[in-house]
Amino acid sequence: MSSQIIPVEPFDYVVFGGTGDLAERKLLPALYHRQMEGQFTEPTRIIGASRASLSHDEYRRFASDALKEHLKSGEFNEAEVEKFTSRLYYVSVDAKSEQGWDDLKKLLEEGKDRTRAFYLAVGPAIFSDISEKIRDHKLITRNTRIVVEKPIGRDLASATELNDTIGKVFREEQIFRIDHYLGKETVQNLMALRFANALYEPLWNSAHIDHVQITVSEAVGLENRAGYYDKAGALRDMVQNHILQLLCFVAMEAPTSMDAEAVRDEKLKVLRALKPITASNVEQVTVRGQYRAGASSGGPVKGYLEELEGGVSNTETFVAIKAEISNWRWAGVPFYLRTGKRMAGRMSEIVITFKQIPHSIFDQSAGRISANQLMIRLQPNEGVKQSLMIKDPGPGGMRLRNVPLDMSFAEAFAVRNADAYERLLLDVIRNNQTLFVRRDEVEAAWQWIDPILKAWEATGQQVQGYTAGTWGPSQSIALIERDGRTWNDAI
């Protein structure tokens, strides 16, 4: 927890897309919280950059309004907001022309000895333009980093091209490919659980684990992202990045240290060990779904096609996959992955189910003995839960009950749980890449995803309908139940 209050050296953060949705909802509130925790030192500055024509004061009012809308109750402090907005500046720039770049250079010259970070909170179509403008206007110092948001391509070829483009301007050690899921406290606690406790690691293998489930479900629909989402789909949007990164943290071998390269080397080995899914088995191990009209958050909602202009699409809003890792530790242990929109609730969790005891010494009257589970909850309510079998209290003989040992971070620690972006934004300034994705990881993930996309196309695998507000199509239930297992659906 000490990292929350260790100040960082003064820096300049330039946010391209500084008036966009990500900046408004996530980046500005995250930076505000870090100031409130006392981590900023003077003369730290945050510089918004976009095509909109705004003055410094107009941008400060924009930021104040954004904080008022997106901070939780009690977090908006007038004095603190005024202090925060006083360090905000704005430059109107155009990625496609010379407009504003000399103004940005002049502003940055005032802090030429500080750490400098460029955050590309914009679409990947202009990553190249912005990178080249940064280079051409000589804005790169020895302490410069660049932060890149997903999507990193839509297939291996485009990801490689995008990485090449950015790599012509910035060295790999300067590039921070952000996946906000990796900034969640629970993901880092997974490392602590595995490698700081003698209890779990000896059991963390195919001899003791029956299967692993990773679920990332959303209750929302398109939310004004129809143009992007219908070209991407759930596999590209969620599995290629968030879910495969979570899988890596579950399955990786112990790194030699917490050094960024050591951790990412082990994650890369997992990605390269994923068993290929091709046209020969894609229909047996994957399910594509698309939500229909139903109910969500207590009210009726439209189906995907009704939300979509044109009303015709075979894009999946849900995907379930039975993945396998071909290595010594995980051979024979299925990893069931699923993600989707308009599901029964917003939930991200990892469930490790251990194998059943080899022999029961108890009479049938004791009841069914359930397999032990370790549940790692990322959202909502980050925490860790371990299920155990114990004797039911009372004199009525030996009756067994499955009970949870439940640790909620919010209840266990008397501090505010920092948002993922708060941690990651300052890790960029600290030059700590442990929770960021390396180029070869991105490309290895696409090397596994691409054949699935091609297999769907080759086999003509269609999306299966599911009612909004449910856990997905019935075929996804069959995917796991034919192996004698069930999804963990509790929220």
UniProtKB/Swiss-Prot annotation:
Pathway participation: Carbohydrate degradation; pentose phosphate pathway; D-ribulose 5-phosphate from D-glucose 6-phosphate (oxidative stage): step 1/3
For the keyword Zinc, the answer is: no
> Which terms does the record give in the GO molecular function aspect?
glucose-6-phosphate dehydrogenase activity; NADP binding
What EC number(s) does the entry state?
1.1.1.49
Per the Swiss-Prot or TrEMBL record, the active site comprises: H242 (proton acceptor)
The regions listed as transmembrane in this protein's record are none
Decide whether keyword rRNA-binding is in the record. Answer: no
Q: Which UniProt keywords apply?
A: Carbohydrate metabolism, Glucose metabolism, NADP, Oxidoreductase
Q: Where does substrate bind?
A: H180, K184, E218, D237, K341
List, alphabetically, the PROSITE patterns matched: G6P_DEHYDROGENASE
GO terms for cellular component: cytosol
Q: Which GO terms describe its biological process?
A: glucose metabolic process; pentose-phosphate shunt, oxidative branch
The UniProt catalytic activity note for this protein reads: D-glucose 6-phosphate + NADP(+) = 6-phospho-D-glucono-1,5-lactone + NADPH + H(+)
Summarize where NADP(+) binds, as residue positions. R51, K150
* Pfam families associated with the record: G6PD_C, G6PD_N
Q: What is the annotated role of this protein in its UniProt record?
A: Catalyzes the oxidation of glucose 6-phosphate to 6-phosphogluconolactone.
Checking PANTHER family in the record gives: GLUCOSE-6-PHOSPHATE 1-DEHYDROGENASE, GLUCOSE-6-PHOSPHATE 1-DEHYDROGENASE G6PD
| NCBIfam families linked to this entry | PRK12853.1-3, zwf
Q: Family, per the entry?
A: Belongs to the glucose-6-phosphate dehydrogenase family.
Q: What's the protein name?
A: Glucose-6-phosphate 1-dehydrogenase
Q: Which organism is it from?
A: Rhizobium meliloti (strain 1021)
Starting at the broadest rank, the lineage of the source organism is: Bacteria, Pseudomonadati, Pseudomonadota, Alphaproteobacteria, Hyphomicrobiales
